[in-house]
Amino acid sequence: MEKAGYFAVHSQGLGHATRAVALARGLRERRDDLYFLFLAGVPALDLIAANGFDVLTAPPAPDWPSEDGVIGPVWRWYVDYARYLRVAGRYLRKEGDWGSYRFLLSDGEVASVREAIRRKVPTAMILNSVRQDFAKDFPSRILEDYGNFWFSRLARRVDLILVADPAPDWPNVRRIGPIVRPFSAPREKLRDDFVFQKKTILVTAGGTAIGEFLLRSAVRAFRALHLEDASMVVVSGPKLKAEPAPGVYTYGFLPNLQDYVLAADLVITTAGKGTVNEALAAGTPVITIPPKDHVEAERNAASLGYRYEDIGRLQELIQEKLSIGRLPPTPAGNEEAVRHLLDFLDSKVGTR
């Protein structure tokens, strides 16, 4: 008998969507009786649909306020996010078929979790962290502290929480390793398929508009280097547009970005977990330049020895990283995460 459930995805950027796709594939490989109807707004919706899953259009989450790669006062985002929760909550109460869909998996999407708990639907969450720490000014700290308090009360009622970063020692929390989408072919075949004949630098800005500063700086640094044995592939994402130039090839959106990460010789990214984890799993050298004051991205970048100010060193870093060759791949945590989710489904959904 088929077990159908919702898989809600936080739609700010594409990192949550790529992780959700990887987990859904892993679950379906182990259990062909599972069916997921994804709930997502743009741009996550497009990536999920391009990977072959059914998806119901949901309200989109707000983007961070930013200018030239610097996050603005985050109280503005918290106000917008509170409005999003109200809009998404009304949508889920009206459109959700909670009688037919017997469980909820959520990658970072909170409105669906609140509604599922209200309806006593078994719920599992996948998170980077259980609390936010972006606030720099007093108004932002007030809103962030309240948001963290509110979410901690909600999170304790969730059946299972899988967390990538350090988390409280709650009985429903499990730490997991990096989740990545599997590569579709060996590296050399992918390079042939993509016609990568030179050393290839892949630049990706993620799914938000905040990465424009990195696209601009990376292309400028590459052109200044005049590397005859290298080319650059720029993936601007759904919210930005990059202009092609000699030796620079541009794409707006790639549903199989992980394959380009494996095929490339160097990845330059804004330090989102998804692309960083895929580069580490592929053994591809990576330069991570985080948006300034984006605490999560700064933490990801710092773990690899980078910070926002390294934007001024891109020429030097590109030459250095192209010279080191491939790196040992980092093991992924997909199998462990899938096992936790299957245990949740068997124990909480099997008898419903």
Label every model-predicted segment.
Residues 8-21, 209-213:
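A short, glycine/small-residue-rich beta-strand->loop->alpha-helix junction that serves as a flexible
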Residues 24-26, 187-266:
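Donor-nucleotide binding loops and adjacent catalytic segments primarily
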Residues 71-106, 110-111:
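Conserved nucleotide-sugar donor-binding subdomain of glycosyltransferases
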Residues 117-134:
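Active-site proximal beta-strand in glycosyltransferases
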Residues 320-352:
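C-terminal amphipathic helix plus adjacent low-complexity
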